[in-house]
Amino acid sequence: MNTNQVSTRQNSLWLIAAMAAPLAKGASGCSWPAVLAMGGFTLLVGWWLGRYRMAQKPWLDILQGLWTSVIISEMLYWCGDCWPSHGNGKAAALILLALSTWSACRERQQAARVGCMLIWPVGLLLGLILLSAAPEVKLQYLYPTWQMPDAALVTVLLLTTLYTGKGKGESAGVCVGFLCFAMITAVVAAGTLSPYVSSTSKAGLYELSRSISFFGVSQRLESVAAAGMTIGYFGGISYLLSIPEEAANRGRMVLAYGALAGLLFAMNIRLDSRIIAVGSILLWIIFPAVCSLKNLFQKPPKTA
């Protein structure tokens, strides 16, 4: 969670570009009450992390890095789901991983500049899909119902909270923005596809792009959705791989974590998304809290 080598604003822009596609994937499979509940939980976690000190042990850094590889391998599956009609989703995902690893191997400031540039294509392409589908929303599909939230959404929301500067004022606004984006995506996906279809689809935004019509004429925007999501996953994977910035062997760590993610994906070793979510909560919230019981309720010193 070290972000001191890039400015807070730069980190926020990079994080927006990196997490927009994973967040859209998770939110498109959830009902809006579930998104609201999970968003409120992660905002509370962000406030807590910003208010109280959390210890970080070397062994915990290693476990978090290994678990990050598991999350990245899951993102590769999400990327492959964006290209179901082409039959080469696995190859596209592996190429994406190679490019993301190459980007992350450079200095973090350079990777951040590249990541910030992604906010424009990701925002425009995903925004086009959501705006085009909004007129197709049926109000009867938006009746409040509770569905167990997609565990992928839990993991992504947790990541957005962890890497936004630990509760600083400008970062709190980014977290609220992520929650609003997730709510809009959930409402548009469920209102257009129906709650059942959106919750059972592997790639809700891709399915959403097939249900758009202009003036009664059906439009096929699958390529637009797939391109926007793929660019977003590139940003997300490169961001996660770029997190270890202060280690002397940073380049080798990035290559090792990227290789582990690729190996898990190539060998079809995939954990259930609920296990990934529980593991993320344990490694980034529970274990650090247990390791820092002495200063858990000690407020951090004020900075000038």
Language-model-derived ranges and their functions:
Residues 25-29, 53, 81-84, 96-117, ...:
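Membrane-water interface regions at transmembrane-helix termini and the short interhelical loops
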Residues 72-81, 120-144, 189-190, 290-302:
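Hydrophobic alpha-helical segments and their helix-loop junctions in multi-pass secondary transporters
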Residues 75-88, 166-183, 237-261:
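Helix-loop-helix connectors at the membrane interface of multi-pass transporters/channels
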Residues 90-94, 100-133, 277-288:
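Membrane-interface loop-to-helix entry segments
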Residues 251-254, 262-282:
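Extracellular/periplasmic helix-loop-helix junctions in multi-pass membrane proteins
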Residues 16-93, 97-98, 287:
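Membrane helical hairpin/interfacial module
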Residues 5-25, 34-42, 64-72, 105-106, ...:
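Hydrophobic, membrane-embedded alpha-helices of multi-pass small-molecule transporters
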Residues 192-221:
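Membrane-interface interhelical connector segments
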